[in-house]
Amino acid sequence: MRTWLSITLVVFTIVARADGPADNIVEKVRSVPPPGAKIPDDVRNELRDGADKLRKEIDSLRDNLKGKSNALALLPDIEIYHKAVDWALRFDEILNPTNEIPAARVLLKQGMERVQQLRDGKPVWNSATGLVVRGYVSRLDGSVQPYGLVVPATFQSNNPREWRLDVWFHGRDEKLTELNFLTQRQKDPGQFTPRNTIVLHTYGRYCNGQKLAGEVDLFEALADVRKNYAIDDNRILVRGFSLGGAACWQIAAHYPGHWAAAAPGAGFSETADFLKVFQNEKVQPTWFEQKLWHQYDATDYALNFFNLPTVAYSGEIDGQKQAADMMAKAMAAEQLELTHIIGPQTRHAYHPASKLEINRRIDSIAAQGRDPLPKRVRFTTWTLRYNTCSWLRIDRLGKHWERAKVTAEIDENTLRIESENATALSVVMAPGLCPFDAANRIRVVIDGKELAGPRVPSDKSWDVNFHKLGGRWYVGEPHEEGTVKRNGLQGPIDDAFMSSFLVVRPTGTTAHEKIGAWVNTELAHFTNEWRRHFRGEARVKDDTAVTDADIASNNLILWGDPASNRLLSKIGPKLPIAWAAQQVKVGRKDFTASQNVPALIYPNPLNPDRYVVLNSGFTIREYDYLNNARQVPKLPDWAIIDVSTPPNSRWPGKIADAGFFGERWELTDRR
């Protein structure tokens, strides 16, 4: 359904850079973020001294607060100020000295004020209204990450009421350092500030459309907000415009049971057509890249909008109207109709009358809230990374990167399920929510086969597993030996960087000098790019210093070869790709070890609940930074990299071979 509104236009600008054909040249890639500007030495020294002083005060405060967990939990709210200025100086990220030098002084002053407040036991920001910036420590890399809040004037910290929360995803801004983000979030409340609503502005680890580590940032920031504010779980909404609209599409599509509503504006919703239309790029993906588009193409998850009220917006003459048009087409194929508000004769901005109409609809949906137990769920996925919608969970797939589809419906005391490409399912209804009659057994019909479900316990919960064996469904968990692909342990390589990870560098010498040089270059490239693009410093240890506790709590990112990295040598015989001094063997294929390096992800033989990765960081590279629609995993579960071809802005070398492991993490020839 398209709704057209006409009124005199007031333009709301969105910070963005116009991408185009100039950004389609692999050999000529500009820097993102851009290079910093030169600042006077006396100003640099002044800010450096201020940041160092703030760091010392934070460290002293941490010592003084030992044993006071509630107060210690507030330290990230101070550390965000230090990081913002410290990083701007250390990494030459003062981009506009006229604005950012005064802003840095303000942030240092605010950081010192919070130090004093916390030392006095009066952290006033914890109960403040208006524009508030806060932070949390990420489990991924131990870094401090910021977020902004708009706290309504009606908020009272001692009031037990639960608040509606709207999450706002920001647009593309290549200059959005922590310094600029904190400054913006203390000046600009944003496009939408509904009454009696807390608005969360995520940083998203810079400029990635809430993908990969940026996706994790949403949930970590949300968890931190919940610690400090009483949030109504059934009235959390997601919104965004431009790159934020793209983020909204993908977060809504992958997590449809989490939110009360979604309101994406502009942006993009898939990779191939957007790059063709908006970027004028001739896209020629490898077969595995094309499969990996299924991770973030929201169009592939269009069915999931059956479960989530959604109001899309586009300007009539905005090139990014393409995003909602593509979603409308994909939803129509699922017999769904997209509500699409269109601002007449409007480019890349919100039309004021359209904003009113969006608010009318979204506020009405929010007043109803999310249904915690819908009678019917229709859910699709391509990977177990995204496996849950409301009370339905897909636990195993027949084959990753092919579509799985499940429809589940409650019909009085019968549960009916129809499935495709799913081999294990769970139904999880929280205490008090199960609608079935506790006095009778529940009838379950899966793909036409009738099963007897367990009775409802006295707390009115219901948690039941189903598995498929030999083409038939049974009640209970699957009986499995060895490792299998499951949620959080399904690949591809980039998945290792969506939970806590530890980089393990080699202390020995590689068997081949060329391999050693490549390892050193790519390890440095990864740690530098993680800092620049995911705004954290990767934790790094020598292979000789890794402890049992490290192995228990982290994905291990091993660099080197069996000769140079003792951990790689230890686990190597248990990996499906054999790596000897002269040869790398992948099934029946052999590669010369003097010029080929395996990169892979696999359940860690030393801790099968965590990953081990060989010789790879996250797989998007500098070319992909230039348009966010390119920021999709580039390598599958394993790859053989021919290092005789030097790394460039797209690849770590020539990809001699690559593929996905099967559902039992076995080598397979299937594509």
Language model: regions and residue ranges:
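Solvent-exposed alpha-helical segments and adjacent loops
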Residues: 416, 427-671
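Short beta-strand immediately N-terminal to the catalytic nucleophile in serine-hydrolase-like folds
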Residues: 238-240, 263-265, 313
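Amphipathic, heptad-repeat alpha-helical segments
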Residues: 20-78
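Mobile cap/lid helix-loop segments that gate and shape the active-site cleft of serine hydrolases
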Residues: 171-184, 257-303, 307-308
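A domain-start/cap signature at the N-terminus of enzymes
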Residues: 20-37, 91-163
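Active-site machinery of serine-nucleophile hydrolases
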Residues: 162-229
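Gly/Ser-rich "nucleophile elbow"/oxyanion-hole loop immediately N-terminal to the catalytic nucleophile
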Residues: 154-161, 211-243, 253-259, 304
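C-terminal catalytic histidine-bearing segment of alpha/beta-hydrolase fold enzymes
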Residues: 313, 317-415, 420-421
